[in-house]
Structures are given as C-alpha cells and as structure tokens.
Amino acid sequence: MSSENSRNKSRPAVHAAEIVREYGPFGSATQVHGVTHDGRRVWAATGAKLVAFDPASGETSQTLDVPCDAGTAFDGKHIYQIAESRIDKIDPATGKVLASIPAPGNGYDSGLTWAEGSLWVGQYRDRKIHQVDPETGAVVRTIESNRFVTGVTWVDGELWHGTWEAEESDIRRIDPKTGAVLERLEMPRGAGVSGLESDGADLFYAGGGSSGKVRAVRRPTTGRQH
C-alpha cells in the first residue's frame, strides 16, 4: 500500500450533520449546558434548572431546581449532573441530591455520560475524556482528544464526543483506546455543541449553548458495529 493510500485510509469519514429537529428555548433559560436521555425523555441542563421534555411532542414534562452548569448523565435510575467542581447524583423524581463526588477537572469539566458502570467526563480545554468511578470520583483512565470536548456519549460500543471551537463544531466518533478520530459530523457554522447524548438508537441530542436549544442529529448508519 502506498503512503498516499495509507493516509487516505486513516482519514476520518466526514459528513454534514443532519439536524432532524430543534427544541427550545426552555422558558427563560438562555443556555443549554448538558443533555441526557432517560429512555423516554430528554433532559437539558439550563444552569439553574434541569428540564425534561418529550422528544415526540417537544412539550416540557418536568423541571428540577438544581445547579446544572455542565454535563448531564442517566444511569438507568439516577441523574448525574456536573455542578461547578462536583458531580451530583440526583433522584429524578424529587430533585434530591443523594450523593456528590469531585469532578476530575475541578470546575473545568464539560460533557458527562454513563456507560459500563462508569461515568465518562469530558474536560473542555484540556481536550480529555476521563473514565470515573461513580462512587469515589477516582479517575480510572483518560482518553486524549485533539479538540475541545463539549459532550460525551457511548452507543453500541462507540464513543462519540462533541467539539466546539470558535464558530466550528462537530460530533465525532473516536477510538476509545487511542483517541484517533474515526468519523465526524460537521455542524452548521455557528451551531455549537454543548452537551451530547444518544437515544440508544438513531439520534444524538446535542445542546446548543447560548441558543438555548437542543438539536436532534441523525446518527449515521455507516461504520456501525453489529
């Protein structure tokens, strides 16, 4: 194989992101900092309130008054929410904080997701994704990225994360062992990603930062693991 072919083979597949739908803004909220999906509803972290909405109707079904200035995750029973330098474990029925652990970035964390019994925490400017013990906050391992990390999600064994630098933003699939970029979905210019979660099927939900919106983005079918 020639070096040119080798270079082409290693380049990630790049697609224009297909935005299926936009939701929000939500009430008086002007920001979306984190997003998760509980199997039925999408949750958006808007700074002082977690807002749950039905992705079919777009209607808000619940709000929780909790600090929520970065990533959000759901483990099947509880919500995990970054609040400054900590990660709170929250009862979604009541909003009660059941436990807290230190966030690895000490206030500079962004994305958050749950997979394989661990929390996965994005560190924005450090361009890192940490696997974190949800009981203690200890960092189990770290994956390096080459872009600012603004959201993290796992789906079907694939690790995806959002990026946002200046007016450019994308959703990218990376190799969880090496951090190599395997695939990129380029968002329209100015449509930043602040929080990312998969619905476990065909869609990503991406926070839209200061737009106050959440965008549903089609997950590509190419390259999926079976």
Please tell me what each predicted stretch does.
Residues 47-55:
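Beta-propeller domains
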Residues 7-29:
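A short helix->beta-strand "capping" segment at the edge of beta-propeller domains
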Residues 42-48, 79-85, 121-126, 161-166, ...:
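Conserved beta-strand positions in repeat-built beta-propeller and related beta-rich domains
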Residues 54-58, 91-95, 133-137, 175-179, ...:
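Short loop/turn segments that connect beta-strands within beta-propeller blades
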Residues 51-52, 88, 130, 172, ...:
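WD40 beta-propeller blade core
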Residues 26-39, 66-76, 104-116, 146-157, ...:
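Beta-rich, blade/repeat-based domains predominating
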Residues 193-226:
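Blade-level signature of beta-propeller repeat domains, shared across WD40, Kelch, NHL, RCC1
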Residues 18-26, 59-64, 96-102, 138-143, ...:
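A short beta-strand motif characteristic of beta-propeller blades
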